[in-house]
Amino acid sequence: MASVNSDEWRAVCHKFTSAQNLTLVESRNDPDNEPFRSKYKARELLAEIYCSLKSFEVGEEESGGGRPPTEPPVDGQREDGFGEGVGGDSPAGLRAARLAAVEYYLGVNHVDTEELSAGQEHLMNCVKLLERCSVSSENVSLFIHVRNQLGILWAGRDETETSQGFLETAESNYQRYMKEDGSPPTDMTEYFTTEENLLTHQERTKRFELAYTHTMYYLAQVYKNLGETERAATYCHSTLQRQLQLNQFSPMEWALNAATLSQYYITKGLYMEGRHCLSAATVISGLAGEAPSEAAAQESEAESERREQLRQKRAEIARCWIKYCLNLLQDSKKLLEDSIGELDTDRQEEMKMARRREEEEEEKGRKSALLFGSEDTFDSIASLEEKVWTLLKPIKLSTCVHSFLQAKEYFEMDGHVTDHVEILQDHSALFRSLAFYEEDLERRCKMHKRRVDMLEPICNDLNAQYYLMIRRQMMFELAEIYNEMMDLKLTLANRQADSETLDNHTIKKFNHLCSASAKYFQMFLDSLCSPEGKIPEHLEEEVLRPALVARFRVARLYSRLISSSPSAQLENLDKSLEHYQYVVQYCEAHPEAAATVETELELSTEMVGLLPLKINRLKAKMAVNS
């Protein structure tokens, strides 16, 4: 091999530096009609380096120095690279590693230029050359990089298990090396660097740890695709931790990934972890700076794009906070409700104390492994966490309200219809959950009225042709809201009245809410009909239960309408019977539907037997009075 200080070797190093510059810097400025111009030039230089290395090798063989790196591997060589073999720091091992490195860079080059088969061939050549060496500080970085690249390549072909194999081998190489050696390993670029330009130990460590961070990131994606969500979350969390520790991250991208990870924890009821991820996301997103003013954004296309990206990603983080608040309230409700779904205040105090003790113990055991941040950011994250409410902790709505405002500001109705409606539905769900904790029935009713005010205008304005499913959701929710308000008003009236007779104002309000609920349930049912208004003979699975429940609710609502006119009362009872009969007859014609509405079917069957008697008595009374 040529001396590291010889002119020949300096020429090789210069070519490598030029190839790196073409790949990493010059390629960014390639014209649209020649998108790979710089990378093709880099490929030519890498090919020349490969030829030079082979010529050095031949020269050494002719002079009798060293075993050629193309000989078969020594017996006993392990598949993962550990075991007996040519040492990584031997001349033959170094030659093989240098040739393998060029194969690696050629492989990446071909993949980048969309020549995947050629790229795979070069990367596998790299793997085969490294099989002739035991893993050492001089080649462990290359061992990991090439398997990372093969993992990415096979994942792109949807060969997830093949990808998994390469990435898990990279992981085991790292862990074994750190256990057996742990010294800062040689970076691949140093194979082609003159002695005076070698990296410091600190920079070597940073690059090596970053390569392993990439391994963990890719494994997180692999496990997610394999449906191993718990392992995927663990690897994702570790990746985010390492990115912060190495100071190698884009603030907004990191923040969005942390916020997304919080959603996994929330669905598992791990609110401490979810809260920590969201607090970290909020703090780190602040490192991206403020969005440019609207005036500045209008003057510069780059500033306009940056403003849009910052606003969008912060709005998406806000939506993740919204989900935290909603899920927290809903899970708290499950813990605190009594047998009829009302707040059990005695149990609330008992469970608050028990849960706080439990949370303290859990946090002591789990939090040390979870923490994000450096000295600069940790205090800010911890401070924000303390301001956010937790399971059974007194409710603080400032974070949640701010999140709704931020999300609505970006996801406006004009241009983001689906997102805007989903945020409104979440806002409605927030008030529904809060109403559970409100003991004042009048205030609880006002909370439900806020939900109506949010949803009703949008529901009526949405185009039924393009947003049919969304309108159905909103119509059903509005029907349920009015139904809840009706029950609350009746309970209030009964509490306040001196006798069992309701005054005219209360009756009018009750009937208005009852009719509004029936109207929206009927709108939902009408949306299932054909354009000619024909009721479907067979209900699709996704609307089967909602449709039958809507029928049952409409029947119940018509029977509850208060009327002083016997003829109007008779008309309402006839309509009620008609809807009860539909539920019973549909389930008789489609036995498989009965399991989806067991309670409603049982009550409908009972009412189909009782209502005709009530109708006949009313008719008889009307006949006598006439």
Task: Indicate where each model-derived feature is located.
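Extended alpha-helical scaffold/coiled-coil
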Residues: 1-626
